[in-house]
Amino acid sequence: MWKIVPLCNKQLRDINKIDILHNGHFRKCNTYKSGGGYDKFPQIAEKRLGKNVFNQFIVQLYGCVLDCPYCYVTKDGYFGDYVLYSSKDLVDICVKEGLEIFHLMGGSPALYLEDWYEIIELLPNNIIFHSDLLLLEKDYKLEWLNSIKTSNSLYAINIKGVTLDDFYKNTNREFNVGLFLRNFDKVMESGINFYLTFTNPDKRYLNEFKDILIGEYGKSILDDSFVIDLIEYEALKD
């Protein structure tokens, strides 16, 4: 069973009422529009998977390992009272709503990485499974990653800082370098389909950080990567 946190009152400030689903337990949105224009997921999905998709079903899981001050989900949205859903229930709702992308979101959705395959196996091939990895939730197992490598899945690795100070500023957490690198190596070994995003990076050091990644993993590691600049969400205005 999945711990799903319904939309909280702060989140609702930024959500169109027509996008609220299932009594506020879920929402839908246009992928490009939802990011204020920054999200390149539709273009990447078309390039990598050959699918022209925009409309996503958003499932918000309980829990997060970070404390990002800019997070529009807010603590109420990932540490709020949760309700339980089975994988089949979630997939059935997505299919019924006619949505093209199943977005398993957080918080930190990879806290549940070992269970993602349950949803993926139930999804029709015409629906893309999308979720996010921080590489910091816990030690990944290669078998978990192998279980989510499919022709209709696409993942984002979200990098929250390009220096130790930058990471702390963005997350209120110390950067666990060893865990990050161990998980990055396992992701690379697994061959899952992913791209990188850089959230609010210190741009003075961004290219230097990218060079480190290229030196470790090759130039292709940056294919389709992009920067996510911060947006002033209504959810964060008290």
Predicted regions and their residues:
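Short, charge-rich binding segments
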Residues: 48-51, 92-97
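Auxiliary Fe-S-binding modules of radical SAM enzymes
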Residues: 1-22, 182-238
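A general structural detector for well-ordered alpha-helical segments in enzyme core domains, enriched
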Residues: 89-93, 115-120, 144, 176-183, ...
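Acidic (Asp/Glu)-rich catalytic clusters
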Residues: 94-95, 144-152, 213-218
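N-terminal [4Fe-4S]-dependent radical SAM core
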Residues: 1-65, 69, 73-78
